[in-house]
Amino acid sequence: METNYVILLDYSSGEIIKIRLSDEEIQKSESYEDFEMFLSTIESKYNFRLKDCYWMSVEYLKERSYI
């Protein structure tokens, strides 16, 4: 499975952060043994703190909302 999207649940701010990784970011992420280490390199770019988030990575993004 190729990771194209990262979804973060920031429990300190109550935000859901959806990131579509660029081709360059996907390539860079593959050079890390641990995907979480890669995520720490993009914290400042996307303005989140990994220690305050739960995350998942997916190839395809699907959403449902019951609001």
Question: Which residues make up each language-model segment?
Answer:
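A short beta-strand micro-motif
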Residues: 3-12
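Short, flexible N-terminal segments of the mature chain
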Residues: 13-44
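A short, compositionally biased
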Residues: 1-4, 36
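Short, mixed-charge low-complexity intrinsically disordered segments
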Residues: 35-67
